């Protein structure tokens, strides 16, 4: 449970024909952008659990989100209508921008399989923070993913289609778990 209530929210930003949804708990952040008909640009923060429960129950049709200056928000779809109180998005912690010129390309299936085959051997306690994640070691046209918990070690090597500048990063296990839930397959 987070102590900052804004971190339990989804930031909804409407502008110029797009709606951006952002969630961030300071450890894991996710963002998606969809097309939409915007009558007036604006930003609000909606309680993530309530918003998800509402959207999950809506029929597969167009959804309208309206809000006023006091952040009273009305969500409608066909005959369904929900009223909730949102928050100002001013206190929301935005995701850092990442330069996309330093990317490695692998298939979604491969990434999901690599995580599945290595995630079991990450440490589940915070005594050694570095062991609660996985090392992604890029060297030329090879990606090596390594995880260990002090008793077990998992190593998975993948041949990449392109050559890349050598780089090593540790990705938190929590992040990898969430990514693997999102990926198809």
Label for each model-derived stretch:
Residues 1-185:
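Structural preference for solvent-exposed beta-strand-turn elements
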């Amino acid at each position: 449970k987070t102590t900052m209530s804004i971190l339990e929210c989804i930031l909804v930003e409407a502008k110029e024909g797009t709606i951006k949804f952002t969630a961030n708990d300071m450890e894991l952040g996710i963002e998606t952008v969809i097309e939409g008909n915007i009558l007036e640009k604006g930003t609000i923060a909606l309680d993530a659990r309530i918003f998800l429960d509402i959207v999950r129950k809506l029929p597969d049709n167009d959804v309208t989100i309206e809000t006023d200056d006091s952040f009273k928000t009305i969500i409608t779809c066909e005959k369904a209508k929900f009223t909730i109180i949102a928050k100002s998005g001013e206190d929301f912690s935005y995701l850092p921008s990442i330069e996309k010129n330093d990317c490695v390309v692998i298939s979604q299936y491969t990434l999901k399989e690599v995580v599945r085959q290595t995630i079991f051997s990450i440490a589940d306690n915070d005594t050694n923070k570095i062991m609660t994640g996985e090392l992604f070691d890029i060297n030329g046209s090879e990606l090596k993913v390594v995880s260990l918990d002090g008793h077990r070690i998992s190593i998975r090597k993948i041949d990449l289609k392109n050559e890349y500048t050598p780089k090593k990063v540790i990705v938190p296990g929590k992040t990898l778990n969430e990514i693997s839930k999102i990926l198809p397959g």
